[in-house]
C-alpha cells in the first residue's frame, strides 16, 4: 500500500508546477506567431475597430488618444516580450498598430514623467515591486533586444512615492541565467 508523506506530496507539487510552467512557456512561445498572423491581416486606414477586436479580442485597456482617437492596449506580459498599442481614429478605422516595447520608446522615458504616461507609452508591466524602505516602486517589462532568445531583457522604470520616474535601466532577463530566475 502506498502512503503519502511530506516528500511524496512535495514531489507531486513540484511535478504540477513544472507541468504548468512548461505549458505556460509553450503558450507564450505560440503567441508571437499568432500576433504576426493577426497583424498581417490588418491594414492601417482600412481595417475597422471591429476587425481589430475580431483579430485581437478585447483590449486590456482603452486610452484616450489625440483628436478623439482611441488607443487599444494589448498586453503580452508577463511571459511575452511585446505590448501593442492600436490606434482607432474617429472614423472607426485603425490608424496605427505599434509594438511599443522597444529601446526607442524606452529612451523617451525621462525623470519626472508620471506613471500613467509611462503606462500609456509601454502598456501594462509584467511586474510591479514596491520597495517601501527606499520609497520606490519598480515597474518591469520583458522585451527582445535582438532576434535571438538570448536577447531577452528586462526594462525597469523606478518610480518614487509620487509615482514620478526616478530612473530607468535594462538588464538581461534573469530567466536566461544558468541558475534560473532569483
Task: Enumerate the predicted regions with their spans.
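Sec-dependent bacterial lipoprotein signal peptides
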Residues: 1-32
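Residues within mature, well-folded domains
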Residues: 34-182
Amino acid at each position: 500500500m502506498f502512503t503519502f508523506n511530506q516528500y511524496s506530496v512535495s514531489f507531486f507539487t513540484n511535478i504540477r508546477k513544472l507541468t504548468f510552467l512548461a505549458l505556460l512557456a509553450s503558450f507564450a512561445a505560440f503567441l508571437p506567431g499568432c500576433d504576426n498572423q493577426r497583424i498581417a491581416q490588418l491594414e492601417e486606414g482600412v481595417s475597422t475597430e471591429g476587425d481589430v477586436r475580431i483579430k485581437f479580442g478585447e483590449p486590456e485597456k482603452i486610452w484616450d488618444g489625440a483628436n478623439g482617437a482611441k488607443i487599444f492596449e494589448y498586453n503580452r506580459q508577463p511571459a511575452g516580450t511585446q505590448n501593442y498599442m492600436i490606434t482607432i481614429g474617429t472614423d472607426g478605422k485603425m490608424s496605427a498598430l505599434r509594438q511599443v516595447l522597444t529601446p526607442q520608446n524606452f529612451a523617451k522615458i525621462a525623470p519626472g514623467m508620471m506613471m500613467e504616461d509611462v503606462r500609456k507609452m509601454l502598456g501594462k508591466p509584467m511586474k510591479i515591486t514596491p520597495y517601501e524602505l527606499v520609497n520606490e516602486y519598480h515597474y518591469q517589462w520583458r522585451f527582445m533586444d535582438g532576434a535571438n532568445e538570448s536577447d531577452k531583457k528586462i526594462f525597469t522604470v523606478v518610480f518614487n512615492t509620487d509615482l514620478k520616474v526616478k530612473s530607468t535601466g535594462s538588464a538581461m532577463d534573469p530567466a536566461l541565467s544558468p541558475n534560473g530566475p532569483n
